Amino acid sequence: MHADPGIEVSLAKGFFITFEGGEGTGKSTQMRLLAEALSARGYRVLTTREPGGSVGAEAVRHVLLSGAAESFGVRMEAILFAAARSDHVEEVIRPALEQGTIVLCDRFMDSSRVYQGVTGNLEPAFVETLERVAVNGVIPDCTIIFDLPASVGLERARRRAANDSPDRFEKEQLETHEKRREAFLDIAAADPERCRVVDANRPPTAIAAEVLSLVEALLPLEGKPQPSNAEATS
């Protein structure tokens, strides 16, 4: 898709949107569809992911998702996630936001709260301290939490992994995935100004339409598409 040549979009500062939820909720697909829709409207968009997103963070991603870091224990894993996030924020996310870009990120700080905090049984104060250091003031303007029964999401993830090796999180038991679903919903309930919950148990096109609608309503007024100078004076 291409931007309408009669539309110019300018953001005084960037807008940071994170995509959260359990395994198999379709986050990555929805992030791609939103990026395409916003780009077609003339916005500058960057898509990224965690763990990873920068050169340093991608190196850590392999260690974390392969299971190679499991022997270190959950506390050390949380530190590795935080180190990857810090590099990602400073090398990719913050510079893009400073240039007026809409940044879409597949997982961010809420995943650490859920995966390392709730189901990793780390004390909240430790998780919060790591988060504060890692994000260094870069907080999402909007977090979209894709909600799906854990059994459905896990089955989707396993089908997706049929032609690939499932990562260590996809191998975990249903009970663990159910706890994570509830934890994400708890985060949304505690921070309704930032978080929006979207029913992910629907066709992708229906979900994408809802996501685009809610994001367009949240974008700052100075970033709304306006007629170009040529159109305004015609």
Curated annotation (Swiss-Prot):
Q: Tell me the GO BP annotations in alphabetical order.
A: dTDP biosynthetic process; dTTP biosynthetic process; dUDP biosynthetic process
List GO terms (cellular component aspect): cytosol
Q: Which InterPro entries match?
A: P-loop_NTPase (IPR027417), Thymidylate_kin-like_dom (IPR039430), Thymidylate_kin_CS (IPR018095), Thymidylate_kinase (IPR018094)
Per the UniProt entry, the Enzyme Commission number(s) are 2.7.4.9
Q: What NCBIfam families does this protein's entry cite?
A: DTMP_kinase (TIGR00041)
The protein's name is: Thymidylate kinase
Coiled coil, from the record: none
Q: Which Gene3D superfamilies match?
A: P-loop containing nucleotide triphosphate hydrolases
Q: Which HAMAP family match?
A: Thymidylate_kinase (MF_00165)
The entry sums up its family as follows: Belongs to the thymidylate kinase family.
The UniProt record gives the binding positions of ATP as 21-28
According to the UniProt entry, its GO molecular function terms are: ATP binding; dTMP kinase activity
Q: What does this protein do?
A: Phosphorylation of dTMP to form dTDP in both de novo and salvage pathways of dTTP synthesis.
Its catalytic activity?
dTMP + ATP = dTDP + ADP
Keyword list, A-Z: ATP-binding, Kinase, Nucleotide biosynthesis, Nucleotide-binding, Transferase
